Amino acid sequence: MIKLDILSDPICPWCHIGKTNLFRALQKHPDHPFVLEWHPFQLNPDMPEGGRDRRAYLEEKFGGKEGAVRAYAPVVEAAEAAGLTIDFEVIKVTPNTLDAHRLIHWAGLEEKQTHVVQALFEAYFEQGRDIGDIPTLIDIGVGCGMEREMLDRLFASDADREDIRARDAHARERGVSGVPTFVIANQHVLRGAQPPELWGQVIEEILEELNKQAGSDATAT
């Protein structure tokens, strides 16, 4: 199997689109060799813990309402092409995602990581839920099969806060400046929301190489 490390943030629309495109390719190639692991990268690491009003934040970031609309036009187009429903009007808060990344980390310990990542994307982009809010995160985790009592206990503590920050910082030190970023076998990097056709080509090339290696090994024995 081949490790596919994915650096992502659950409030990043390109990450949602990138995941959707990747999984469309994986569904077409059920024999794909990938084992997925999700890693933290905060788009807004300095966001206050309670988040900020999304409209005010975006208008400040992009120089007014028209600038924000222009900046998000390619996102809307790409989301439609991916078959996604993203309701930006329903999103009221831009949250700090540190606690969401803690949840993703804990989900990985139970092999529920991708399920939780998808649930976070849907909660934020389709339902407008505040995924910086701990009760909301606990509900999402429970909906993915995690234990409520365990999540209550973990979120009441500082468990893994510094670990998430350190992993985010390590990614930046390695040159990651945006997400999604996909790292194949700790060697090859793909940046951005790549189309499913490209992922299909990558999968086929890897499978071909693995088959060649298997043939060489069989010949050698």
Where do the language-model regions lie?
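Short, flexible active-site loops
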Residues: 59, 83-89, 100-102, 121-125
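Short, charge-patterned binding micro-sites
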Residues: 41-52
